[in-house]
Curated annotation (Swiss-Prot):
It comes from Mus musculus. One of its GO terms (biological process) is cellular response to leukemia inhibitory factor. This is Ras-related protein M-Ras. Its main location: membrane. Residues 206-208 form a propeptide.
Amino acid sequence: MATSAVPSENLPTYKLVVVGDGGVGKSALTIQFFQKIFVPDYDPTIEDSYLKHTEIDNQWAILDVLDTAGQEEFSAMREQYMRTGDGFLIVYSVTDKASFEHVDRFHQLILRVKDRESFPMILVANKVDLMHLRKVTRDQGKEMATKYNIPYIETSAKDPPLNVDKTFHDLVRVIRQQVPEKNQKKKKKTKWRGDRATGTHKLQCVIL
């Protein structure tokens, strides 16, 4: 089956933000999605953005993904990227009960910054390949997602990956349901523009 050519212009851009505690596997998920490799260790002090043309449900789009740092010292940057994000993946590790308990903090902060009662988000239960270390059950995750009225998905970035592409694609689908695509084309360019050649750009925190 032939692959359709990538349109060169007039593509909608979706700014997706990956949030969650440090060490839950946000970078591993993002790198697996963009580069199709599993990186078990990653510098926790770096925030990266990635740019990718992708086809979802026969519609091409540009995904501009910000992989955020989970450490508290970067908390001052959170409101900035939350203001410009079109959708959010709230990630926790099923092996880390504290990261699950902190989901509420991220959820409430997003709604407060957006000044909305609801916003495109997906609750992501990561590291499900580590079944012997699992501390948060599927039912607990689903219950929390139902409480927030957002989708729930279980993932693993480790090869072979589980639901990695689906997670990012599903978030775009949620955004499309709420925001007409024609309006997406009129949006201003992202503030965390990635390098088109490498698909990644290191962000720096400036303290005023």
